[in-house]
Amino acid sequence: MSDGFAPKQENWLSRVARQVPGFRGYFEREDRRAADEAQRRALAERLHRSGAALGGLSQRWLAAGAIDALPLVDALRRRLDVLINRLGNAPRGYSAFFDRQQIDAARLEAVYQYDSELLWDVELLAKKIEEAVSSAAAADAPSLFNELTAAVAVVEERVAGRENVLRDL
């Protein structure tokens, strides 16, 4: 490419490709569906591993007698489960993105950008959940719930934005 975009794109894309299973498949039309599915499943699995730890938080708070905090954990778990299902079970290849021989570079960049941001946001959410599970006291339940719910909302918005970008291709 001689548009002056290639070096920046290559460095950025190389980083994403190393972190997301199957991401390199986006470059080839026939591999796009498989790459998209692999990416979504990897992100869903990351959230699932972190979300599973919320059960330990519930048990710890129950043992401490903080029964009032349990509905907050349950509500967070339900919302996280919906997000995990949305990521992991989305229809495979639901956009013209997966059928086109060539994609406009700007549109492809938008998809890559969403994927990179989604990867970052999922990792941030997973780490916040893991930190909360390892150290949160029941007295912190309301503020913790608000913080984690906000982090879930960021990922939900990122997933919706990515779906819109793919739909508009």
Whereabouts are the PLM-identified features?
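Charged linear interaction tracts used for macromolecular binding and regulation
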Residues: 52-144
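Generic ordered-secondary-structure signal
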Residues: 4-7, 26, 39, 72-75, ...
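Preference for long, well-ordered alpha-helical segments
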Residues: 135-169
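Leu/Val/Ala/Ile-rich N-terminal alpha-helices, chiefly Sec-type signal peptides and the beginnings
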Residues: 1-62
